[in-house]
Amino acid sequence: MKKMKRRFALMVLWLVAFPCLALDVRTFGAKGDGQHIDSPAINAAIEQASQAGGGTVLLTEGTYLCYSIHLKSNVTLRLEKGAVIKAAPVTDTEGYDEAEHNGWPYQDFGHSHWHNSLLWGENLEHVTLEGEGMIDGTDVLSRGVHQRGPAGPAVANKAVGLRDCSHVTIRGLTFVRCGHFALLLTGVDDLLIEGVTCDTNRDGIDIDCCERAVVRNCRVNSLNDDAIVLKCSYALGWPKPTEHVLIEDCEVSGYDVGSLVDGTCTTRTDRAPDGDGPTGRIKLGTESNGGFRHITIRRCRFTHCRGLALETVDGAEMCDIRVSELVMTDICNSPLYIRLGNRMRAPEGFHASKVSDIRISDIHVTGADSRYACLIAGVEGNPVRDVTVRNMYVRFRGGVTLEDVREQRGRNPFFIPEARQQGQHGEANYPEPSAHGIQPAWGFSISHAEDIRLKDIRLETILPDERPVFHFENTRNIKVSRRQ
């Protein structure tokens, strides 16, 4: 009993000694002048807070030029207003941490490594990144897969990379031009991302193999890639699902890179690198091994970007998906795209993908591209099942002719070589509405599907369109009720 009392007393003393340990990085030698490399000082402050059992590392106003920053358990990194962590350029002698080994080849390079990030952590818990400051990767963080700079030191291709962590909070920060990913979060459970702004080159927020995640009140602009995307890849070496995820009250867009943060929201660039229009959407997929379950997306706005995409093509089961109260404006492809494919980037003998139990309601879309309609597609012998779309209004641009359909005028050539070679309906292709070609209907095009219910649907076009409203192919039990 005496030993227990003594331990309790020591615990109380520890809590009194470190109730809110706060360490200013300037006391560790950081300059914040935009010229001096400050990552050693920031890492020293993080390490001291970690050794003390936890605390807050504070960055006051200034520009902190940095290479790799190593996050630690029980440590909060707080950037005050005017504080900027800026990615430092690689030199002949200085650079970022090397990308670690990952022996699983079923996902892209970018999804396979975390150490080659501006800020990274692995096997951590209770990590917080917060404040009114900025993470700036302008002209430094790579948009591609290059691992090393021209002179040898490693380059970084993302702002934040976290693997196998829990109880992570990212709140209030702004991420600008952050390379391949602003946030790559793989195997991170009990995750909260709130009030974050991303205005970036490629993917904004990537949540991969995560459980119990909330993304709330975020603005993500990503012309060249997806804004908020859920994945369930094989990057951890096993098919961990992404489940119990809530995305709510977010805005996604495909404006010119940098124009969301500066307030201009310009649209001079009308195409992403794949040849389609601006990306900037919310998506599930494409990496899809472990499964998508219990996902809720609600009260979100899409502007000048692609529509909602729900994709499983690598063997994942997608079920219990709930989507509601979306507003979309100026949508450059399908407002709604549900795709069950057969790409199968997975170990040999992996099970086929499945889609069921999807409920979508209260969707309002204006200015949508008519070429690809709202598109639901399974594959022969493996249909999309049990989808309900209710109370959906879509105003398409129209203007497509039957000759356009026959000749596939305006079809994106980026996908044509694969589409001609890989299976009926391109089932092994990268899933994208334009990979299916211009659809034979302008409202809904549904193939290889069963038990699909379209309730209280209102569809119209701005310009006359020669195609019918609906096209069904190899379907069973399709029910439609239209609202005039």
Please provide the spans of the model-predicted regions.
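Extracellular/periplasmic carbohydrate-active domains that bind, remodel
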Residues: 21-484
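Bacterial N-terminal signal peptides that target proteins for export
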Residues: 2-12
